[in-house]
Amino acid sequence: MVIHLLLALVLASADQWPEFRGPSGQGHASDTGLPLDWSESRNVVWKTPVAGRGWSSPVVADGRIWLTTSTENTEGRRRGVSLRALAFESATGREIVNTEVFRVDRPEALNGKNSYASPTPIVDGDRIYVHFGAQGTAALTTAGDVVWRTRLDYQSQHGNGGSPIRYGDLLIVNCDGNGGEGDAYVVALDVKTGKTRWKATRRSPADQAYTTPLVIRVGERDELVSVGAYRAAAYDPANGKEIWRVSYEDGFSNVPRPVFGQGLVFIATGFQQPSLIAVRPDGTGDVTRSHVAWTLRRGAPLTPSPIVVGDQLFVVNDTGIATCVDAKTGTIQWQQRLGGTYSASPIYADGRIYFPSEEGVTTVIEPGTAFKQLAVNSLDGAILASMAVADRSFFIRTHSHLYRISDITAGGSRVRGFGGSRVRDAGAIQRQVAASICPGCL
């Protein structure tokens, strides 16, 4: 399994972004030559509409961008919500797959900020795995044909949130409901059949949470770090057996995905009184008193995931306060108000950190022990989905559109036939631009 994990990282080349937060699951991209700045009239290769409503983040592989979305029917006999998988050509933005995976006649109530299509899909070879929380999980071919479907039973108060991950031949999902005993658990499905291979029930008390797990390597063992309400736990990803757990008070409705660096796992504890704890992952049993290295109580995020770059940990909270701390000690090195509100997670690419806000504004900084802002970039639309990076481009989903952002002016000249307000939806001009920056893609 160690070999499989290493190969997955090595083989995930710069033209792939296969899951939420990229090949490592921690928001790091290997691409260079990425744009520093953009706007509606600058460095937009293409912009294409996305039907429906959804906050799943883009994933990219083999020249395609995959998303999920939900569309509502309010007329006629077929009322309810259609949960769909979409694919777009990376070179042109043209929609090439639009498949209904599930139809829900009476969908659950949502938090006003959430959607019925918030978990990010996984693309792995000739399979796409999509997850719509308690509404259903499925595997598709790259042509959009459904291979299998299953439904995971739990009661989610505000809709779905956490994304699935792939570990060998397992698809692993956090299912944190608030329906009482046994309604919060972690489950591993067989990727070929969708059948349950193992299930680990959360310890009591349990409540709703919306997180994505992370597999890390600690010594001679793999650990599946899964954050839930009131506690996080590490499991053996092969069989679901608990390795260690850490508890925290007033922690539920967790959203951020944990990250790992400098020998520590960084965990956001959730709603009400958010904090971020750094845990040494080499323990067993209850490590609450023995393995918490430090706690950040000021500026911890409710929704965006943290990111580790070198010796520093960077976070932005939901109200726009960015914080840099020493990852080993927890010492705050700077805090800065970026402005706006934040749900999307930051990424590190080409030596820079990108923080996209809900207002469509992305603040770019240079990582370091002093705050240094490099650019502020605006698009017309709300951003709650996290960015994808592939083919020396950013793929950004707003509430209504999908963008490909590239440094199309590299070398000092603008791409022929593209400029100013002439950005259009996918079409002939997109193919011309795409061919100039990606020869052979068409």
Model-derived regions, located:
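Sec-dependent signal peptide recognition
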Residues: 1-8
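Noncatalytic, solvent-exposed loop/strand surfaces
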Residues: 13-417, 429, 433, 437-442
